[in-house]
Amino acid sequence: FIKSHKDAPFFLHLSHHAVHTALQAPASVVDKYKNKPVGKYHTNPVYAAMIEKLDDGVGKICRAIQEMGIEENTIIIFYSDNGGSEPVTDNYPLHGGKGTPYEGGSRVPLIIKWPGKIPAGTRTSVPVIGVDFYPTFVHLAKGETSGNPDGRDIFEVVKNKETERDLFWHFPAYLESYLNGGKDFRARPYSSIRSGDWKLIYNYEDKSMELYNLKEDLGETRNMAGLNPTKKGRTL
């Protein structure tokens, strides 16, 4: 696809199967991780092997773009749509996983490669969200967005260090009742808001709230909703 479109603008969306279940990878790569010392938290050699093969696949694309001489005019974005699924994997030090309102479900990898525009090794702690991709791509293509999109141009957000922009998640549904022998759901209806270092979660079933300071408590172990009513009220 890339070779046949290298002389004209193109958009490629490639969704790898890895690292979804069923967990499987070449035996030689699995053995490589089986022979490594056991880690403290992440101890699944098959999962590790799948990640390596995913990395190999991304590397092939990067090399092909470089060999065709279009590297400096091509933006590569590596992104995950959600956190790892429990109990298949452990998202430590984050709490929760895919479908949950916690950081283990929503804090995901995002890497952008754009030679000549983004210096290698650049890092930022400014939060962005998936709905930002649409306005970002439109602006990069020198187009105009229609209506009033929820997202913002990622490059402008990072450039201006808009740390105070609130981010919202709304999940009014029940997700997959396969936990505990089919007796429980992976996720129940919730909404959440990220405001600076703070995150507020509202659970629709019992109308309870959870408030966490992610800067001080990334693992979301201390619910501050009852201890910091002022911040809870401002976030609401």
Language model region names:
Residues 22-28, 63-117, 129:
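Histidine-centered active-site microenvironments of extracellular/periplasmic hydrolases
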Residues 5-12, 70-76, 107, 163-165, ...:
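Loop/turn elements at helix/coil->beta-strand transitions in domains of secreted/extracellular proteins
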Residues 13-24, 78-84, 150-152, 171-174, ...:
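Short, solvent-exposed turn/loop segments enriched in Gly/Ser/Thr/Pro and often Arg
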Residues 41, 45-48, 52-55, 124-128, ...:
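Soluble non-cytosolic domains of exported or imported proteins
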Residues 84-103, 118-122, 126, 131-214:
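C-terminal cap/loop subdomain of S1 sulfatases and analogous C-terminal strand-loop tails that border
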Residues 10-15, 47, 51, 58, ...:
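Beta-strand elements within well-structured catalytic alpha/beta cores of enzymes
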Residues 2-3, 55-62, 66, 134-138, ...:
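Non-transmembrane alpha-helical segments in soluble domains
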Residues 1-46, 85, 91-92, 215, ...:
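Active-site His/acidic residue clusters
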